[in-house]
Amino acid sequence: MPTVTISPTRCKTALNRTGIPGYRYCLNPYMGCSHGCHYCYADTVLRFSNRGSRWGEFVAPKVNLPEVLRREVRRKRGPLGSIILSTVTDAYQLAEEKFHITRDSLEVLSEEWPDARVDLLTKSDMVVRDLDVLKRLKNCSVGFSLAVPDDKVASELEPGAPSPSARLLAAKRLIGEGLKVWAFIAPVLPGVTDAQGMLGELFSVLKGAGIEEVYVDPLNPYRASLERLKAVYRAKLSWALRSLETYLSDPRGYLRTFSRELALVSKSHGYDLKLDHAR
């Protein structure tokens, strides 16, 4: 793993409007992400950060975000609206162990607006640490993002993230504590997520963890992340390269085929899923 540069910073705003359906605000406690997922679209923030580091090699903790959040929430009139953590970072990346910005922000929400809908999406089992705070939020859920169930394959694609098996253990723990937990199969990596038997195994482990709510999202071929992803496919996942090339040349056709497979495999494991993007 490359060295990650940590550069604490201060923010002017905490809650930012988001265009993600179902949410009014996003909350991003960090700029950058040490998970370094090769397919991540969030490296577009580099264009605005004046940082020369490559994606996955810098993290800027927004050290004053909890206090800014408290001021913003107190100024709100009427319902706060739904909040997603996070959209361009992982709120539970390694830096959170030291800076606890995510935990402090959740504390603020639990104190100032405990009825607010708060959904967390993470690749980290660290979220279990904050069980006590999550339980104080009356309308909170935790989503775990997984592209594959295989720890070794995942380590090639998500070198700084906790393993899928660690995430699933965390999901099972949260469910056992009464929290609402869901899974986000994202992105669908051509030739990998849908490799022979892989999709069935993924649904099997999700079911085994007790997860009943699942969402699916295809790969977004942003230029910068696509170059990184292609390099990983060539070096580590050569058996899937042809599928990636097929997807890039005809994404609609590929997704139509995948959507049919998704419907069949998910149904065989007790889910009922389709890919809206394939219509």
Residue ranges of predicted features:
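Conserved radical SAM core fold
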Residues: 84-94, 124-129, 140-161, 188-192, ...
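A general structural detector for well-ordered alpha-helical segments in enzyme core domains, enriched
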Residues: 69, 101-105, 130, 166-171, ...
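Short, electropositive alpha-helical surface patch
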Residues: 99-102, 135-147, 193-212
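Hydrophobic faces of well-ordered beta-strands that scaffold small-molecule active sites
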Residues: 25, 83, 118-120, 142-144, ...
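Conserved strand-turn element in the central/C-terminal portion of the radical SAM core barrel
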Residues: 160, 173-195
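Conserved Radical SAM active-site core
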Residues: 1-34, 38-143, 151-152
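Auxiliary Fe-S-binding modules of radical SAM enzymes
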Residues: 1-10, 16-17, 194-279
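Surface-exposed amphipathic alpha-helices with a cationic face
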Residues: 110, 135, 171-177, 263-267
